[in-house]
Amino acid sequence: MSSISLNVLDDSVLIKPISEEKQGGIVLPSSAEKKPTKGEVIAIGEGSRNSSGERVTLTVKAGDKVFYRQWAGTEIEHNNEKLIVMKESDILAVIK
């Protein structure tokens, strides 16, 4: 992805979904396809605020590959790319 002109807020994370490769040449209707649960972190917010008003930094960073909950976040389209904005708490694991 080239330059991002989106400013992600608070503890939100911008994810570019990574589709799994299909094998066997079977074409499924879009309604039958499994929603991706793997993606790349494109941008992160500054973090939420704790009870003292201090920022709590996020664990993930741009460039991390992650697994996330299947129905997490809100899908958006920006510069003809499908992206998902979700809370960091919807991320299940960072792929090392």
From Swiss-Prot:
SMART domains: Cpn10. The keyword Iron does not apply. Keywords: Chaperone, Cytoplasm. GO terms for molecular function: ATP binding; metal ion binding; protein folding chaperone; protein-folding chaperone binding; unfolded protein binding. GO terms for biological process: chaperone cofactor-dependent protein refolding. Its main location: cytoplasm. It is found in: Cytoplasm. It holds the Pfam family Cpn10. GO terms for cellular component: cytoplasm. Together with the chaperonin GroEL, plays an essential role in assisting protein folding. The GroEL-GroES system forms a nano-cage that allows encapsulation of the non-native substrate proteins and provides a physical environment optimized to promote and accelerate protein folding. GroES binds to the apical surface of the GroEL ring, thereby capping the opening of the GroEL channel. Heptamer of 7 subunits arranged in a ring. Interacts with the chaperonin GroEL. Belongs to the GroES chaperonin family. This is Co-chaperonin GroES. It comes from Wolbachia pipientis wMel. The lineage of its organism: Bacteria, Pseudomonadati, Pseudomonadota, Alphaproteobacteria, Rickettsiales. The gene is groES.
